Amino acid sequence: MTRMRVHELAKELNMDNKDLIDRILKLGIQVKNHMSTLTDSAVLKIRQQFSEAKTETVEEKRIGRAVIRRRKKLTEGESAAAPAEGEERVASEALPVEAEMPAQPVEAPELIAEPISKLPPEVGVAQPQLPEEPEPAPEPLIPAVKPEEAAASELAVEPQTVVPPVAAPAAEVKPARPPMEAPAPARKPPEEKETKVKHAEPESLAEPLPSPAPVELTLVPAESAAGQVAERTDEEEEEDDKARPKKAKKRRRKKVRKDEPARIIKLPEIIPEEPEEEAVLPAHLATRIQVKTEEVEVKEAPRKKRPRPEEFEKEAAERKAKGTRRKEVFEREDLYSKQEIAAQDDRGRLKGDKRRPFAKEPARPEIAVVKPGKRKIRVDEAITVANLAKQMGIKATELIKKLLLLGLPANINQAVDFDTAALLASEFEFEVEKTGFEEEELLQVREDRVEDLIRRPPVITVMGHVDHGKTSLLDAIRDTNVIGGEAGGITQHIGAYYVMLPNGNVVFLDTPGHEAFTSMRARGAKVTDIVILVVAADDGVMQQTIEAINHAKAAEVPIIVAINKVDKPNANIDRVKRELAEHGLIPEEWGGNVTMVGISAKKRTGIEELLEMVLLQAELLELKANPAKPARGRVIEAKLDKGRGPVATILIQEGTLRTGDVYLCGVNSGRVRNMFSDRGQRLDEAGPSMPVEVLGLSGVPNAGDDFITLPDERQAKMIAEHRLVKLREKELSRTSKVTLESLFEQIQEGEIKELNLILKADVHGSLEAITDSLLKLSTPEVKVSLIHFGTGAVIETDVMLASASNAIVIGFNVRSETKVQELADQENVDVRYYDVIYQLLSDVKDAMVGMLEPVFKENVIGRAEVRQTFQVPKIGMIAGSFVLEGRVERNAKCRVLRDHVVTYDGKISSLRRFKDDAKEVKAGFECGIGVENFNDIKVGDILEVYELQEMKPVLESPPGDK
């Protein structure tokens, strides 16, 4: 006989492994764990001990005339104590429920008592897993009892099936928890009986309900039933809580097919097997037992011992399917089916599998699907790939892949502009809404009332070709000598002047005529009311004259032509008018609408007539402005002054600017600290059409920026910071955008030489003009690169940057301190200063030429014919030659021609005439010539002697130039 293990014996006895091990150790049998084996004698001893422990005695006690209490006592007092207390409590609670019924059939329970006392205890051990109980299941709170005792009570129920259902629920109440006993009597077993009993006849079903006869019979079995119920295990009682009418019916059908003898307590199965027992009992009693059987039914593998409160039963019944476990209280129906949950263990894992079945479920993409109403993203001027991916709710790697497919390599932190973001969003079916800082709402322009408008001086811009007399004309009008202060005699700044005339005040803007100052001229045309186009009578229409005409037409500004230098002998006014007519400026005397006046700025003739025409044109325009509103203007010029800091020349267009006003200018904001007129006079306020120099700027603004005054300094600072962020994002997206094509071009450009420059200028306008001109100098061979530029003097950081990047520092109209020059000498940095722009551009061109590879030109200086060869020891082959033409020089380049084919190209190593070394031999003489590292000279070869002349390289024209 094979040995039995502890866990097998525990299963047979329906005990927990630990409890059984404790009992075994008390018997003196040594075991280690539940896998330990037991000898046959040990098993027999254990079984005998349990059999003796289960010996029962039944006590009967008459409580009243119609009530008899039977108490089943175990030999072990402690195991029988709990059921006894339960019985007493059950009996006392059952009395009020059954008190109305007569006590006639008291004898019937006596028939039940005999089978209970006669049952051997071994029978309960033989069937440890009986799923059915005769006791009713309405109460969830049942005390735990040993499996053997439960089995014994199940077999004893057969005669007790006559017990009415009213007392049985009370008998099942767990004595350890009296507060939960109250709901038991409230239930109505007779109603359940009528719906669930199958084996009882219809008349027997109807009899027990109206008849009070079963009252006493019900109480007697209730006592015995209480004793039996106390022996049931907690697991069985907890399963009783789960019992439902539907489930009870289905499970009973299954159990009938199995014919398990331990389940004879179910009257529907017991009736055909033991008819003699049922014949003794009245039909109405049998019917009531079926009701209790239905309530006690549905027993499965034992689960948690803690019962569910009654108030949760209804909710649990709706949520659970049959046979499901209590673990379903963890609601995961959103992600998993109930079958998946039922297949999981207590830790949420598949049974027999350590992997979590739902580990990958929470990452389902459909859970994070963006709603249709939210498929719109907001993008400013630029946005990083990471922020765009976050708004779209997709991975940034997906956007990077899409950018690669579009030919735009990018990383997660790279900024893309609005158009690229819109293209990306459309690929993922998103809409893009361009949003920005709503400056328009904060900077709303108030409409002027007619009564608030007053006349303002006209703004006149003087334009024309370089050296045609623009500044000389202004000097004549202002009675000053501005041109004397300009380097090189040409205007390199845009100047603003307020001139008071007898017939009215006028504001003049003097723009440069040099080709480098195109942006200045365009800026002047945008802020002006009238343009005076100066044309030299001796030169006629030139390149910048045509450009000025186009700027004025683009700004839709009326033009008055001043034909200067009419006092010169070679002046030709008619030719000038004819050339202007070719460009759309028809003189009034020719039927056009353009006023043309001949003047001489040096002799100051025609000036008054010109001013009259200007004021007449201004009256026709009816120029008005409101001085009572916040000031708005335009930056004409800006610079960084060493003593005063950033200084900007502002032309007030409307409103009045006062000292202390809060301003916003581009990305700068602050308060106006001081104001000065064009003549250097301090001003407290400036009205419309008045140019002023403003101090107190937080930085050097760009020429052409709007100058606006605001009531709140915090608001101005917020707008300025927002503009700065937008500017940085825009520059970042422009500089960091690298396409596959541009990447290939950069690889090819590795051989292109690059001239690095650091540019510092006095004013922003000059800086802008020089920057544009320098960038236009780039050629396919040499590229001009401005690694840094700004306004102000050359400082130490500029020198250090130039040293690190191998750059040249250029200062325009600025100088540096002595220590800066010493640092430049120490670092071997070339620092150059200029006052005239064309000198600067010329030197930069020369520097670019110096970076080109030298060009050599080949000049043939002589030819000699080999007529005889000589072998000289330690020297080699010597060619006795006759100089046919030119001359032969020692160390000159030489080619050996044989049959007009170059055999060797080398150098003449020795040259002799007779026995003397010669420096050169001219034509018509014979000489001996030795060719370096070449001895295969033959008679008839021609020696061609040449020299390489180094030529100055020439820069190719920049792309686009003609």
Curated annotation (Swiss-Prot):
Where on the tree of life does the source sit, at the highest rank?
Answer: Bacteria
Q: Does the keyword Nucleotide-binding apply?
A: yes
Primary site of residence:
cytoplasm
The membrane spanning regions, by residue number, are none
Q: Which InterPro entries does UniProt cross-reference here?
A: EF-G-like_DII, EFTu-like_2, IF2_II, IF2_N, P-loop_NTPase, Small_GTP-bd, T_Tr_GTP-bd_dom, TF_IF2_bacterial-like
Q: Region (G1) spans which residues?
A: 464-471
Ranges of compositional bias, category Basic and acidic residues: 188-202, 308-327, 344-362
Which residue intervals make up region (G2)? 489-493
Region annotation G5: where it falls in the sequence: 600-602
Signal peptide per UniProt? none
Low complexity: bias regions: 156-173
Show the SUPFAM superfamilies listed in the entry. Answer: Initiation factor IF2/eIF5b, domain 3, P-loop containing nucleoside triphosphate hydrolases, Translation proteins
Pfam families under this entry?
EF-G_D2, GTP_EFTU, GTP_EFTU_D2, IF-2, IF2_N
Q: Which UniProt keywords apply?
A: Cytoplasm, GTP-binding, Initiation factor, Nucleotide-binding, Protein biosynthesis
Does GTP-binding appear among the keywords? yes
Instruction: List the protein's name.
Output: Translation initiation factor IF-2
Q: List the lineage, top down.
A: Bacteria, Pseudomonadati, Thermodesulfobacteriota, Syntrophobacteria, Syntrophobacterales
The gene name reads infB
